[in-house]
UniProtKB/Swiss-Prot annotation:
Organism the protein comes from: Shewanella piezotolerans (strain WP3 / JCM 13877)
Protein name: Ribosomal RNA small subunit methyltransferase H
Family membership: Belongs to the methyltransferase superfamily. RsmH family.
EC number(s) reported in the record: 2.1.1.199
Keywords: Cytoplasm, Methyltransferase, rRNA processing, S-adenosyl-L-methionine, Transferase
Function: Specifically methylates the N4 position of cytidine in position 1402 (C1402) of 16S rRNA.
Catalytic reaction annotation: cytidine(1402) in 16S rRNA + S-adenosyl-L-methionine = N(4)-methylcytidine(1402) in 16S rRNA + S-adenosyl-L-homocysteine + H(+)
Record bears the keyword S-adenosyl-L-methionine: yes
Primary location group: cytoplasm
Length: 318
């Protein structure tokens, strides 16, 4: 029997409102998950609207069956980093009215011990978003050099004790390979001296391994750049981040494309020419969940929503 896990979409109302839904518009939900954001978009679309959802998790593809009778909806099995490719294959490049991206790990993924994402539930050390392909976390840990592990923990988890943890993992795996989440989490908890308040010592390392195994930051970079190529003029980009690495990427991306290309001082160039290189404008300030939402869903606590709007200046080259 398949166990079901509840998932509450974070910043649901704010994120969909940021898309400025048109009844006959075409929208992308690049991170379908369990369909919370997609459902909200479909509620606001008219009969001629269209929603294309994307997810690389086979369980998410199964969850999309809930919309199988809605002709406005279709699901693509793949990574959100390839959204521009999928849109181009559909002949919709430059015609998308909104792109929604939610970079969080869904509650069903965290709560299902068999997926191997959680340090609070014992399960196989997997962590793959698409568990039908690619190396598992256990396979990577078994082969990775100490220097490589330390780099991953520091770069993707901002873990201060990265080298110490990497050395301890390498020493322990010589005796017994790490195959279960609890084995790795218990080791990290045991060797960590300066513990952060209200945070499990393994939090940063598990985050780092997950990001590395799934090439998450590369996927984010590709998705953001891809959104620029598929959005129609005045099309919206709504992006939810869950940790500082992701949010910095989104913030810098919107800022860079809002300012246009940098021009050497003294170069004779008009403001109109500079504006031609601007591709986005930021919409409002970063949005964080309300106290009420955090009380309902503690996993929303670290989420940040940023919204951008596609400018038309260079669309003649799209």
């Amino acid at each position: 029997m398949t166990q079901s896990f509840e998932h509450l979409s974070v910043l649901l109302t704010e994120t969909v409102a940021g898309l400025n839904i048109r009844e006959d518009g075409i929208y992308i939900d690049g991170t379908f998950g369990r369909g919370g954001h997609s459902r909200k978009v479909l509620e606001q679309l008219g009969p001629n609207g269209r929603l294309i959802a994307i997810d690389r998790d086979p369980q998410a593809i199964l969850a999309a069956e809930q919309f199988k009778d809605d002709s406005r909806f279709q699901i693509v099995h793949g990574g959100f980093g390839q959204l521009a490719q999928y849109v181009e294959e559909l002949g919709l490049k430059g015609k998308i009215d909104g792109v929604l991206l939610d970079f969080g790990v869904s509650s069903p993924q965290l709560d299902d011990a068999e997926r191997g994402f959680s340090f609070l539930r014992d399960g196989p050390l997997d962590m793959r978003m698409d568990n039908s392909q690619g190396q598992t976390a256990a396979q990577w840990i078994a082969r990775a050099e100490i220097e490589d592990m330390a780099w991953v923990f520091k770069t993707y988890g901002e873990e201060k004790n990265s080298r110490h943890i990497a050395r301890c993992i390498a020493a322990d795996r010589e005796k017994t390979p790490f195959l279960r989440t609890k084995e790795l989490a218990d080791l990290i908890a045991r060797i960590t001296k300066n513990k952060e308040r209200n945070k499990h010592p393994a939090t940063r390392v598990f985050q780092a391994i997950r990001i590395y195994i799934n090439s998450e930051l590369e996927q984010i970079d590709q998705a953001l750049e891809g959104a620029l190529t598929v959005l129609a003029p005045e099309g919206r980009l709504s992006v939810i981040s869950f940790h500082s690495l992701e949010d910095r990427m989104v913030k810098r991306f919107i800022r860079r494309h809002s300012q246009g290309e940098s021009v050497p001082h003294g170069l004779p160039i008009t403001e109109a020419e500079i504006n031609k290189s601007r591709k986005l404008k930021g919409i409002g300030k970063a949005i964080k969940p309300s106290a009420e939402e955090i009380e309902r869903n503690a996993r929303a606590r670290s989420s940040v929503l940023r919204i951008g709007e596609r400018l038309p200046y260079d669309l003649e080259s799209v």
